[in-house]
Amino acid sequence: MYHIELKKEALLPRERLVDLGADRLSNQELLAILLRTGIKEKPVLEISTQILENISSLADFGQLSLQELQSIKGIGQVKSVEIKAMLELAKRIHKAEYDRKEQILSSEQLARKMMLELGDKKQEHLVAIYMDTQNRIIEQRTIFIGTVRRSVAEPREILHYACKNMATSLIIIHNHPSGSPKPSESDLSFTKKIKRSCDHLGIVCLDHIIVGKNKYYSFREEADIL
């Protein structure tokens, strides 16, 4: 049986969410907000508690049918449909989060993806890929867009988003509008600079990839500096 811990004090879920944040509310409080109202002889928190008491764990909540929900006094067709819609949306959000976190297995894999995105760009784009402990992408962020003559980005800007995303590793990618991925001296200098900054914060700089027209250069594959 799913364990419910009821509080003695009067609960005002909406006000508590505003004051404390959604993560501080109990499961029955969150469900009560979705249900909105109870019935004359049963407050909404009592209804939400009864729903949760009908399942062995929160993971089973999504398995409740419309008929099972409607068998609970205070839950009619409208509320049961709203609950099922909320559960389906939550499932789709979870799937979208998982799909977004593509796992990077090699520099070549990422380079091929980025050649499609940046290979034909007329301006230089500097992109950072932030990853978790399993090399799954947390965020892909364009740090800078500039001309061939001016494409400077400070490591602190790159690392700001690494810290914000709680990333454990990152890969830097930029394109050469000329189509040739051959690194320049400034590319080499920047790579060393970003690696030093990452090391200082305990973030792993896995690679710096330069993409051109159907070609790429990986500092990890070609140079002994990462």
From Swiss-Prot:
It comes from the Bacteria. Signal peptide: none annotated. A motif (JAMM motif) lies at residues 174-187. Zn(2+) binds at H174, H176, D187. One of its GO terms (molecular function) is metallopeptidase activity. Keywords: Hydrolase, Metal-binding, Metalloprotease, Protease, Zinc. Pfam families: RadC, UPF0758_N. Residues 103-225 form the MPN domain. One of its GO terms (biological process) is proteolysis. Belongs to the UPF0758 family. This is UPF0758 protein SAG1101. It comes from Streptococcus agalactiae serotype V (strain ATCC BAA-611 / 2603 V/R).
